[in-house]
């Protein structure tokens, strides 16, 4: 990925994010995530989508499920550019967890899961560990996670 390119320009060239790109296209979010931002994206990789129950991804990609898909995807986006260092500071300053307001208006939590790792938690108690952090983009930053987190 190239820091001079935006989130979408980089994601479409990532072999590990083909499912995410297909979902972003189906939800009509390409224009938004190509915009100036800045955005912090907690980006599930293909393996994260593979962990969902069989048939979930094809079902979400159907036009009639665009609203649900948009809600899930925007739950992975936080306004602003939050580096791993920013996330660690927020977690350390708040007793081991930090609350983030997502682009869909709901809350995600960042929690320490070890001395070296943070995870993103949803309201249902599901977590996506940050496996790759600080993938800088012209309009934000991507942190790759190993599970799809879901809004209420």
Indicate where each model-derived feature is located.
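Mature, structured domains of secreted/extracytosolic soluble proteins
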Residues: 1-152
